[in-house]
Design a protein with these regions (language model features):
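Catalytic core of tubulin tyrosine ligase-like
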Residues: 18
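Short linear Ser/Thr-Pro motifs
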Residues: 2-4, 88, 94, 125
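Short, well-ordered beta-strand elements within core beta-sheets of diverse protein domains
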Residues: 9-12, 60-67, 122-127
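PLP-dependent enzyme catalytic core of the Aspartate aminotransferase-like
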Residues: 78, 94-153
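Conserved small-domain helix->loop->beta segment predominantly found in fold-type I
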Residues: 22-91, 107-113, 152-153
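Single conserved hydrophobic/aromatic residue that forms the stacking wall/gate
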Residues: 1-11
Length: 153
Protein backbone atom coordinates (compact mmCIF):
# COMPACT_ATOMS: atom_id res chain seq x y z
CA UNK A 1 0.00 0.00 0.00
CA UNK A 2 1.16 3.52 -0.65
CA UNK A 3 0.58 6.21 1.92
CA UNK A 4 -0.57 9.57 0.68
CA UNK A 5 1.79 12.44 1.58
CA UNK A 6 3.79 10.36 4.09
CA UNK A 7 0.98 9.95 6.60
CA UNK A 8 2.64 6.85 8.03
CA UNK A 9 5.37 8.90 9.70
CA UNK A 10 3.61 12.23 10.21
CA UNK A 11 3.66 11.74 14.00
CA UNK A 12 7.47 11.74 13.85
CA UNK A 13 7.65 14.79 11.58
CA UNK A 14 4.96 16.98 13.12
CA UNK A 15 7.13 18.36 15.95
CA UNK A 16 9.68 19.56 13.35
CA UNK A 17 6.99 21.12 11.15
CA UNK A 18 5.59 22.91 14.21
CA UNK A 19 8.88 24.12 15.67
CA UNK A 20 10.13 25.36 12.29
CA UNK A 21 6.85 27.15 11.68
CA UNK A 22 6.82 28.79 15.13
CA UNK A 23 10.42 29.97 14.74
CA UNK A 24 9.72 31.44 11.31
CA UNK A 25 6.56 33.15 12.60
CA UNK A 26 8.60 34.76 15.36
CA UNK A 27 11.25 36.00 12.93
CA UNK A 28 8.70 37.23 10.40
CA UNK A 29 6.96 39.23 13.13
CA UNK A 30 9.91 41.59 13.30
CA UNK A 31 10.72 41.78 9.57
CA UNK A 32 10.25 45.22 8.01
CA UNK A 33 8.46 43.78 4.96
CA UNK A 34 5.77 42.05 7.00
CA UNK A 35 2.49 43.74 7.85
CA UNK A 36 1.00 40.84 9.85
CA UNK A 37 1.86 37.24 10.79
CA UNK A 38 -0.89 34.68 11.36
CA UNK A 39 0.29 31.71 13.41
CA UNK A 40 -1.23 30.05 16.46
CA UNK A 41 2.09 30.09 18.35
CA UNK A 42 1.90 33.88 18.58
CA UNK A 43 0.03 35.25 21.59
CA UNK A 44 -1.52 37.92 19.36
CA UNK A 45 -3.39 35.23 17.40
CA UNK A 46 -7.11 35.32 18.33
CA UNK A 47 -7.19 31.53 18.83
CA UNK A 48 -3.91 31.28 20.75
CA UNK A 49 -5.46 29.91 23.98
CA UNK A 50 -7.60 27.35 22.17
CA UNK A 51 -4.66 26.27 20.00
CA UNK A 52 -2.50 25.68 23.08
CA UNK A 53 -5.12 23.24 24.37
CA UNK A 54 -6.13 21.55 21.13
CA UNK A 55 -2.74 21.35 19.42
CA UNK A 56 -0.09 22.05 22.06
CA UNK A 57 2.73 20.92 19.77
CA UNK A 58 1.70 23.50 17.19
CA UNK A 59 1.08 23.56 13.48
CA UNK A 60 3.16 23.67 10.34
CA UNK A 61 0.82 26.15 8.66
CA UNK A 62 1.91 29.77 8.54
CA UNK A 63 0.37 32.82 6.89
CA UNK A 64 1.44 36.43 6.63
CA UNK A 65 0.76 39.64 4.77
CA UNK A 66 3.62 41.23 2.87
CA UNK A 67 3.78 45.01 2.57
CA UNK A 68 3.37 45.98 -1.06
CA UNK A 69 0.33 43.87 -1.84
CA UNK A 70 -0.06 41.10 -4.36
CA UNK A 71 2.83 42.20 -6.60
CA UNK A 72 5.22 42.03 -3.65
CA UNK A 73 3.77 38.66 -2.58
CA UNK A 74 4.27 37.23 -6.07
CA UNK A 75 7.82 38.59 -6.28
CA UNK A 76 8.54 37.02 -2.89
CA UNK A 77 7.11 33.67 -3.94
CA UNK A 78 8.91 33.61 -7.31
CA UNK A 79 12.23 34.52 -5.62
CA UNK A 80 12.32 31.51 -3.30
CA UNK A 81 14.87 28.79 -4.00
CA UNK A 82 14.17 25.92 -1.59
CA UNK A 83 10.52 26.62 -0.83
CA UNK A 84 8.34 25.60 -3.75
CA UNK A 85 5.13 27.08 -5.09
CA UNK A 86 2.22 24.68 -4.76
CA UNK A 87 -1.52 24.79 -4.31
CA UNK A 88 -1.55 21.52 -2.37
CA UNK A 89 0.03 22.07 1.02
CA UNK A 90 1.14 19.63 3.70
CA UNK A 91 4.07 17.43 2.71
CA UNK A 92 7.63 16.98 3.95
CA UNK A 93 8.90 19.94 1.94
CA UNK A 94 8.08 23.58 2.55
CA UNK A 95 5.51 24.94 0.13
CA UNK A 96 4.08 28.39 -0.56
CA UNK A 97 1.04 29.84 -2.29
CA UNK A 98 -0.54 33.22 -2.87
CA UNK A 99 -4.25 32.34 -2.59
CA UNK A 100 -5.41 35.30 -4.69
CA UNK A 101 -3.90 33.66 -7.79
CA UNK A 102 -4.49 30.00 -6.90
CA UNK A 103 -7.00 28.55 -4.44
CA UNK A 104 -9.08 31.77 -4.28
CA UNK A 105 -8.58 32.92 -7.87
CA UNK A 106 -12.26 32.71 -8.77
CA UNK A 107 -13.59 33.97 -5.45
CA UNK A 108 -14.88 37.55 -5.75
CA UNK A 109 -12.43 40.08 -4.31
CA UNK A 110 -14.90 41.31 -1.69
CA UNK A 111 -15.47 37.75 -0.43
CA UNK A 112 -11.71 37.07 -0.38
CA UNK A 113 -11.12 40.18 1.72
CA UNK A 114 -13.88 39.20 4.16
CA UNK A 115 -12.12 35.83 4.55
CA UNK A 116 -8.80 37.54 5.27
CA UNK A 117 -7.27 36.90 1.85
CA UNK A 118 -6.18 40.51 1.43
CA UNK A 119 -3.52 41.94 -0.91
CA UNK A 120 -0.10 40.55 0.03
CA UNK A 121 -1.51 37.46 1.78
CA UNK A 122 0.84 34.45 1.60
CA UNK A 123 0.18 30.96 2.96
CA UNK A 124 2.91 28.42 3.66
CA UNK A 125 3.14 24.84 4.77
CA UNK A 126 6.47 24.61 6.58
CA UNK A 127 8.43 21.43 6.06
CA UNK A 128 11.21 19.67 7.91
CA UNK A 129 14.16 21.37 6.23
CA UNK A 130 16.76 23.12 8.39
CA UNK A 131 15.10 26.21 9.86
CA UNK A 132 18.14 28.38 9.12
CA UNK A 133 18.01 27.40 5.44
CA UNK A 134 14.30 28.20 5.38
CA UNK A 135 14.85 31.58 7.01
CA UNK A 136 17.63 32.50 4.56
CA UNK A 137 15.30 31.67 1.68
CA UNK A 138 12.38 33.63 3.15
CA UNK A 139 14.53 36.64 4.04
CA UNK A 140 16.07 36.66 0.57
CA UNK A 141 12.61 36.49 -1.01
CA UNK A 142 11.38 39.37 1.15
CA UNK A 143 14.43 41.42 0.21
CA UNK A 144 13.70 40.76 -3.47
CA UNK A 145 10.15 42.04 -2.94
CA UNK A 146 11.51 45.11 -1.14
CA UNK A 147 13.94 45.83 -3.97
CA UNK A 148 11.11 45.55 -6.51
CA UNK A 149 9.00 48.01 -4.52
CA UNK A 150 11.88 50.51 -4.32
CA UNK A 151 12.48 50.24 -8.06
CA UNK A 152 8.78 50.92 -8.72
CA UNK A 153 8.85 54.24 -6.85
Amino acid sequence: KSRSRGLGDVYKRQPVHASNSAELAKRLSSHEMIEKVIHTSLEAHPDYDIAQKVMPKGSGMLAFIIKGGDQAALKFMKSLDIIFEATSLGGVESLVECPFNSSHMFVPEEVRHEAGVVPGFVRMSIGIEDVEDLWKDIDSGLNSAKKMMIEMT
